[in-house]
Amino acid sequence: ERYAASEELRGVVRDSARRPDAPGLVFSSHDFGGRPPDLARRLGRMRADPAASVLKIAYRARSLRDNLELFDILLERDRPTIALAMGEFGLASRVLAPKFGGFLTFASLSRESVTAPGQPTIEELVGRYRFRSIGPGTRVYGVAGWPVAQSLSPVIHNAGFEAIGHDGVYLPMPIAADESAPDASYASFKATVLAMMEHPRLDLSGLSVTIPHKQNLVRLAREQGWRLDPLSSLCGSANTLAISPSAEGPSASRSAAVFNTDARAAVECLRGVGVVPKGLHVGLIGAGGVAGAIGFALALGGASLTIFNRSAEAARNLADRISRETGATANRREQKFQVSLDIK
């Protein structure tokens, strides 16, 4: 702002920039408080100054959607440009900078030496996210939930992508939610997922969806007319969104399919130790999205259930739904059972 307000300072800078041996100048705008309301004006002013060799825009992201605007700034660049989002929502802008032609990104030597909120370490950027392998064609995946910083999914999936030679990167994607405002949480989830899917160059190809958005994923799938696997439709909870590229080009609408793999994984684990659901009495501890999906899958496989939960009402509601939809015996009365599953 001082530079913009002082003609004298601008004159000194321009005179210096005209020298044959003058280094290039980086014109930078930082806002640690959030997206500046005059972002377009700031960017236009920097672009109009011939003394600027490199432009840099950085601000604290309010949501994942702020990354998309920064990607557009990179795509519209008229000279080398750095566009980064700070904070917990901004990692995508840092990792995906080479996908959109960013001049550079920043990383710290250690977690203790970060110079901006949300900055990854070099080990995370180069090792976990394989920064040097990211290019325009890299497909983007992520784990969506609130919170997701603790998730090991990026470590597992990125290692898998490297092992099979897949040009993809898997990121933590926090989407804010509030238990006391479910409709607002759904609106946040819907707006974020659709905006990422519709971005013409992001190439979002899939999401693992975790708490508290598993029910929101099913609700969104029904609204959008996406393919919904039978178990997700039955239990009202899903954890996987697979997105197909459009045959009509990147800007066309894209098809999607929604699945629940929680239940299949649990049943396969039981089968792996010789336990089959048919005729089994199962004590199910938990009544959330994962527990519900597993309960439905076991009931469909012929098991009977006793459901335990801190909330008696939640346990009763899940038991009633399973009994009504599958015809299996599901209750919350204590009884002898052969297998107990504690679903945290």
Give the residues covered by each predicted segment.
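Catalytic alpha/beta core domains of metabolic enzymes, predominantly
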Residues: A4-R139
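A structural signal for isolated positions on well-ordered beta-strands in alpha/beta enzyme cores
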Residues: V26, K56, I82, G142, ...
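Glycine-rich adenosine-cofactor-binding loop
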Residues: A85, V140-A149, V258-A263, L270-G302, ...
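Phosphate/diphosphate ligand-binding glycine-rich loop within oxidoreductases
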Residues: T138-V275
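NAD(P)-binding Rossmann-fold cofactor-contacting core
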Residues: A303-T326
